[in-house]
A protein has these predicted regions:
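C-terminal output/interaction extensions
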Residues: 20, 34, 38, 147-182
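Short, conserved beta-turn/loop elements at beta-strand boundaries and strand-helix junctions
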Residues: 91, 104, 143-149
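Hydrophobic beta-strand positions in extracellular immunoglobulin-like domains
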Residues: 125-127, 140
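Short beta-strand-centered aromatic/proline hotspots
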Residues: 97, 135-144
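A generic structural motif
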Residues: 103, 140-144, 161-163
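Low-complexity, intrinsically disordered
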Residues: 129-133
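Short strand-loop-strand
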Residues: 79-125, 154-158
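N-terminal helix initiation/capping motif
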Residues: 1-102, 175-182
Length: 182
């Protein structure tokens, strides 16, 4: 999309700091809900605005651009820092860990024993305010074996085919984390 390279060249950390984060969140959330659920679909102008807002929020939250070297988004969903308790089940093995961040497409789990990419998992995500944890299937997509400048050791998990109820619950967690992060 033509807006991303232009946006990347114009917006820097000084401009991001001038924008009121709560105003960004207020404008982003309804567009993000419609983009995720597709009802009604976003117009091209709304999609471009969603991409601008996502860039500003990601830059504000992570301090780095979510755009790769060729001007393409690195991820389809906004990652938001949050610490949630997660119970991982893989066969008869159970582990409890926490998140570093979450998005509507997946999460990053902090662990010194990351699993191999491609490993399927059953996740139970609990933020302490839910009546019951959100249960969803996921797959390990990448690992960071040691703590480094990019963050703690752990693994990136993609949510696999969440149903509407799971998507809505995950969306609520992301929205709550976004509101708390800014």
């Amino acid at each position: 999309m033509r807006v991303l390279p232009i946006l990347c060249s114009v917006v820097d950390s000084r401009l991001v700091s001038l924008v009121e984060p709560s105003a960004l969140v207020e404008e982003f959330l309804p567009l993000n809900r419609r983009r995720t659920r597709g009802d009604p679909p976003l117009t091209i102008a709304e999609l471009e605005r969603w991409m601008e807002l996502r860039w500003l929020l990601e830059h504000s939250l992570a301090g780095k651009s979510p755009i790769d070297d060729q001007g393409r988004p690195m991820r389809r969903t906004l990652r938001v820092p949050t610490h949630l308790k997660v119970r991982i089940t893989r066969g008869s093995t159970i582990d409890i860990t926490s998140t570093q961040e979450i998005s509507e497409g997946g999460l990053f789990l902090i662990t010194r024993r990351p699993l191999t990419p491609g490993t399927p998992l059953h996740l139970e995500i609990d933020d302490g305010d839910l009546e019951a944890p959100i249960e969803v299937e996921g797959t390990v997509t990448w690992v960071r074996r040691t703590d480094d400048g990019d963050g703690p050791a752990g693994m990136g998990i993609r949510f696999d085919h969440p149903d509407e109820e799971q998507q809505a619950a995950i969306g609520t967690l992301v929205e709550r984390a976004l509101s708390e992060a800014l």
